[in-house]
């Protein structure tokens, strides 16, 4: 009994020590990550047109459900999960940061693969990016302040929400606007450049995430047991919660699948940039964000493969079945 209590105390001490860990990521690599993320956004924007948003606005309910699920429900569910699991404060902050990031555009690929509504997915992703300029610092600050430990840790960094807002605007808003402008003015060039640019930038971004883990492998190996399972549950909650909310709202199956991926696939690249720009590479936050960036691809492939083999019913048939 005493031995077990001693082991539990040691486990708790090791788990809490992650709040003191700072990951190794030099300023040059940090600048490179910022540039790569901007290139990812620019590459995505080369394939966006104002007409794409007009198409999405024909189904405003589905668009609104997707944005509410992503920016309001998921952060709230994340806070509830943190309160239930009670991880180390830096891990909890990492979970909140991931939940507050915009949707990752690989969600569009998973939606298409899962036979969801791709145009809805693209619209939610893009509007989510724009909304995140305000919603990311707002959600992180609001939900962290609801817990004394996370709030104290957040205050220790003297975080300026306006500074974070400005950085997100530069990393997302400027490349997005530049890409859409080039797409409108030079459509032939944008069409040729979009594919190679998107593939190249995404591969480099994944390389940065993997590289960050490799450089800090000893730290990850020591603390992985505190993060891996939590990220799995967190991601599953996001995917299931997005789908369940869309179903409860009365959306058709294709739209439900889109909302599921738009809620459960996050822009972890932006999250990693923010961890190093504003939180000094805080161990728990960085490990959660980096591991999420790997795991949500695995989970997205599994779920999209499952749905790919189960074509959604046509809208009329689905309504008839519910009746």
Question: Regions from the language model: what does each represent?
Answer:
Residues 4, 10-323:
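Alpha-helical transmembrane segments of multi-pass small-molecule/ion transporters
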